[in-house]
């Protein structure tokens, strides 16, 4: 039995040895797994360290820039970076152009004082513990700096900054309110009333008469002008010739022609004394010529006048007889 066990012992040893791994291959696999894990952990640590370093550098840069702006604003020299003029003419709040230079120079420039600004804010029931910040350069106003406070909205800025801004804009940088109040439109011009006036002219100028007065009245109604000539009637007693002349308009024309001709004859006789006649025969010739001219004028008027009633015809003949006499 012992022998059987001894015989079975080697068999069992062989089976166990065949089933268990070799001691040389196990440490090699463990070493390979350990190297890969170490590389992964190292890569993660390197990336995390790089991100942390970048964040720290960015924070330091922002702090340094903020500190530099604060230092330059309190030093009094080169205290603010000048705002760059925009290439556009209007910007967001512009109206196509800046403020007129004359208006810009008329805006008041004051020396800023924090105590004065705090007192003014207290009177207006406003809390202004942080002071006034210029919206153009994003820096606070310090004591002794020149500042402009816009008249309409009351916002304050550095004088240089707001002058540069208003050179290309016409509104406040904060509230976009126009700096200058636009002028009110002009009221419409009322239409002129119709003109009416009276001009008195002597009748001798208008009709060649010397014993009457005439009035010329110009009246404007609905945009049209009308000339009215008024000839007053004579206060003397009327004669049959005047009655006949009133009954017929052609006789009135004839009288006008006769008087015009007589005035022209008197003017010609007065201007040239050498043409005056010394004999009675010459006077007779002048009377004949006068009668012929009057007859021709009467015929011309009768031809131009339409048919008249018998009474008017008789009056015209009577007037013609008087004229010839």
From Swiss-Prot:
Effect of residue 165 to A: Loss of E3 ubiquitin ligase activity. Rootless phenotype
Example GO molecular function: ubiquitin-protein transferase activity
Single GO biological process annotation from the record: protein ubiquitination
One Pfam family cited in the UniProt record for this chain: zf-RING_2
Induction: By N-acetylchitooligosaccharide elicitor and by protein phosphatase inhibitor calyculin A. Induction by N-acetylchitooligosaccharide elicitor is inhibited by the protein kinase inhibitor K-252a.
Chain intervals with Gly residues compositional bias: 88-99
InterPro entries per UniProt: ATL1/ATL16-like, Znf_RING, Znf_RING/FYVE/PHD
Pathway connected to this protein: Protein modification; protein ubiquitination
Outcome following mutation: residue 162 to A: Reduces E3 ubiquitin ligase activity. Short crown roots with necrotic lateral roots
Gene3D superfamilies: Zinc/RING finger domain, C3HC4 (zinc finger)
Biased composition (Low complexity): 15-28, 268-281
Keywords, alphabetical: Cell membrane, Membrane, Metal-binding, Transferase, Transmembrane, Transmembrane helix, Ubl conjugation pathway, Zinc, Zinc-finger
Span list, region Disordered: 1-29, 70-105, 267-289, 303-325
UniProt key word Cytoplasm: no
Catalytic activity: S-ubiquitinyl-[E2 ubiquitin-conjugating enzyme]-L-cysteine + [acceptor protein]-L-lysine = [E2 ubiquitin-conjugating enzyme]-L-cysteine + N(6)-ubiquitinyl-[acceptor protein]-L-lysine
Residues spanning the membrane: 38-58
The protein's Enzyme Commission number: 2.3.2.27
RING-type zinc finger locations on the chain: 134-176
EC class (word): transferase
Alphabetized CDD domains for the sequence: RING-H2_EL5-like
Consequence of substituting residue 164 to A: No effect on E3 ubiquitin ligase activity
Membrane topology: Single-pass membrane protein
Main location group: membrane
Role of this protein: Functions as an E3 ubiquitin-protein ligase in cooperation with the E2 ubiquitin conjugating enzymes UBC5A and UBC5B. Involved in root development. Required for the maintenance of cell viability after the initiation of root primordial formation. May mediate the degradation of cytotoxic proteins produced in root cells after the actions of auxin, cytokinin and jasmonic acid. Mediates 'Lys-48'-linked polyubiquitination of MBP in vitro.
Domain writeup: The RING-type zinc-finger domain is required for E3 ubiquitin ligase activity.
Protein name: E3 ubiquitin-protein ligase EL5
């Amino acid at each position: 039995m012992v022998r059987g066990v001894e015989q079975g012992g080697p068999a069992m040893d062989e089976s166990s040895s065949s089933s268990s791994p070799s001691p040389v291959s196990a440490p090699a696999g463990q070493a390979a797994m350990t190297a890969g894990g170490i590389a992964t952990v190292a890569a993660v640590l390197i990336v995390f360290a790089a991100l942390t370093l970048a964040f720290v550098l960015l924070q330091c840069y922002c702090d340094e820039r903020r500190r530099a702006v604060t230092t330059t604003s309190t030093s009094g020299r080169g205290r603010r970076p000048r705002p760059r003029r925009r290439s556009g003419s209007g910007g967001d709040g512009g109206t196509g152009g800046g403020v007129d230079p004359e208006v810009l120079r008329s805006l008041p420039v004051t020396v800023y004082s924090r105590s004065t600004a705090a007192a003014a804010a207290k009177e207006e029931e406003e809390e202004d513990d942080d002071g006034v910040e210029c919206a153009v350069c994003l820096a606070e106003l310090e004591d002794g700096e020149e500042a402009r406070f816009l008249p309409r909205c009351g916002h304050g800025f550095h004088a240089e900054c707001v002058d540069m801004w208003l050179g290309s804009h016409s509104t406040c940088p904060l509230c976009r309110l126009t700096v200058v109040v636009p002028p009110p439109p002009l009221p419409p011009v009322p239409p002129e009333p119709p003109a009416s006036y009276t001009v008195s002219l002597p009748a001798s100028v208008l009709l060649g008469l010397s014993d009457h007065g005439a009035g010329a009245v110009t009246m404007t109604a609905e945009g049209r002008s009308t000339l009215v000539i008024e000839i007053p009637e004579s206060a003397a007693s009327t004669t049959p010739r005047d009655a006949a002349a009133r009954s017929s308009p052609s006789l009135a024309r004839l009288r006008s022609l006769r008087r015009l001709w007589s005035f022209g004859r008197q003017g010609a006789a007065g201007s040239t004394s050498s043409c005056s006649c010394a004999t009675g025969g010459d006077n007779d010739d002048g009377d004949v010529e006068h009668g012929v001219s009057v007859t021709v004028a009467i015929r011309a008027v009768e031809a131009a006048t339409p048919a008249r009633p018998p009474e008017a015809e008789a009056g015209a003949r009577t007037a013609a007889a008087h004229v010839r006499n």
